[in-house]
Amino acid sequence: MSERDAVVGIIGLGAMGRPMAEHLLAARGELHLSGRSRRHRDLEERGATWASSPRELAASADVVVSMLPDLPQLEAALDGPEGMLAAGRPLLLLVASTSSPTGVRALAERLASSDARVRVVDCPVSGGVDGATAGTLSIMLGGTDADAAEAARILAPCGTPVHLGPLGAGQVAKAANQLVVGATMLAIAEATVLAERSGIDVDRLWTLLAGGYAGSNLLRSNHRRLVDEDYAPGGLARYMVKDLGFAADVASATSTHPSLLPALRDAYAELVDAGHGDDDLSVARRFVAER
């Protein structure tokens, strides 16, 4: 079966999953959907098929992309009488959530030791809602050569997939990515507050600095949020606590002794404790200002 002939489904149609589903549907002409509620009838009008349960999704799809928040939600969708495993069909499972590398490997081992005929590729994404909408996500693949190649062909409409190594490699790469993102966002937030309190127009400041070494995709995509103090959630700030925890796990497993990571974990835990966990990550500006 070619990747074009494979029937593809996606579970998890939140801020990232919904635009990814749009790109997959546009590229393939058909797509099977599953989520907590049937809120995406416009996709059905364009050719998508709604599955009322994970079991129904896996009964129709050869490949399922999971955009659920993390592994506990995915395992709940796999197990039980209405879970994907109950469909009893071979399945390529693409784990696109940010998860623990160890956890992804353990899930694959559990599935391999059972009667389930499920192959797993981890494929976390980076680029945020803007990247998901534009179809420019960075997609980090971990898995066997054959499975990762199939995953890359299927996910290509959503961005740039790159195979980085065996199962779990994608999640290690995403942990590294989140370490950079978390540090950069907090640095931008602190710089914004100290500049504003010094009487500098932060809109003009970031327009200027975006063209220098301080410029980044993160700054460009959050420029207006920082200036307008609009923290309506794109990606929830509380997820950074989870993600940095995965980075700490990788550091421990590789005998790496980071100096910045512990401080970042403390700062984002404090941000969540201050009540900002359900805001966008750019709420770091408000958090810094209120400390």
Predicted regions and their residues:
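NAD(P)+-binding Rossmann beta1-loop-alpha1 motif at the extreme N-terminus of oxidoreductases
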Residues: 1-66, 129, 157, 162
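Rossmann-fold dinucleotide-binding core
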Residues: 8, 77, 98-179
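Helical "substrate-binding/catalytic lid" subdomain
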Residues: 169-291
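Hydrophobic beta-strand scaffold residues
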Residues: 31, 50, 119-121, 162, ...
